[in-house]
Amino acid sequence: MIEVRGLTMRYGRTVAVDDLTFTVKPGLVTGFLGPNGAGKSTTMRAVLGLEIPAAGEALVDGHAYASLRRPMRTMGALLDAGAVHGGRTARAHLGCLARSNGIDSRRVAAVLDQVGLAEVADRRIGGFSLGMKQRLGIAAALLGDPAVLMFDEPLNGLDPEGIRWIRDLLRSLAGEGRTVLLSSHLMNELALTAEHVVVIGRGRLIADTPTGALAAQFQRDVLVRSADPERLAEILRAHGVSVAPEDASDTGMHGTGMHGTGGLFVRGMDAAEIGELALRAGIALRELTPRSASLEEAFMELTEDSVEYGAGPAARSAAVSEVAR
């Protein structure tokens, strides 16, 4: 596991990480989220022993990473894909890492093949694209066949095929029982990849929860379609709930309101209660769908007061409208 306990990081008067505590467990891909300046990269550097905490600790399998004799066999990490010697070949770069950690040289060829760089293994890294460097960084993280893996923005520079590849790779690694921590600003990808999320803002923990549960906290409404929407709307309003007709902009259908789609957006009553009410009234339902926020929307709401540089109200309102479409 990765354990962060009461971690505090200070730079002069600035508190970058503030008494942060969370655990990254094996068998899951855990997303590590936060706005720019939230302290994500600082926390990951502390896990690797690259930053000295003012208080608290960050442990890998119960030990400080710097105390491990062969650290790459315990934990693999990618923080900066560009932090490589451009004059070396991919094979030579991984070979040096392997020798430094007592790793069999045969692993070099294996991980180069695994990340799709076997054909360019003897090319100098300085000529690699960002996506190729990301793949090389991932190969380095996998080199020691570690049980714990940590990646900071590994999707940067990858094309759609590469993004799908790493999504499948991370899931398969977690499926083998490994611990996987993934930091990324690509919310749609995290929603598809991460089963658990840790959200921080201004260095403090905001949420530590399953991905689905986070979105469910921000349930917007229930979409209801029935054969008699006007009567159902009247009954629902009589029970004190908010009812709005579904218009064409929400469905892509022609026509508006209840006459156009038969859809209602209901707030203040859950799906089960709406279904029971419709049953008692003898109204057949065609659809009953709770609509929760996306991971991106939930993240924006959670971190609204934690952003380092925020847009003005007008721009923020426009951005939220775009997300909701």
Residue ranges with predicted function:
Residues R267-R325:
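C-terminal coupling/interaction segments
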Residues I166-V266:
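ABC transporter nucleotide-binding domain
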Residues L142, L236-R237, A278:
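Hydrophobic C-terminal alpha-helix "anchor/cap" residues
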Residues I2-V4, M9-G201, A207:
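ABC transporter nucleotide-binding domains
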Residues A110, G212-A216, G312-A314:
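Short, flexible cytosolic linker that couples an ABC transmembrane/permease module to its adjacent nucleotide-binding
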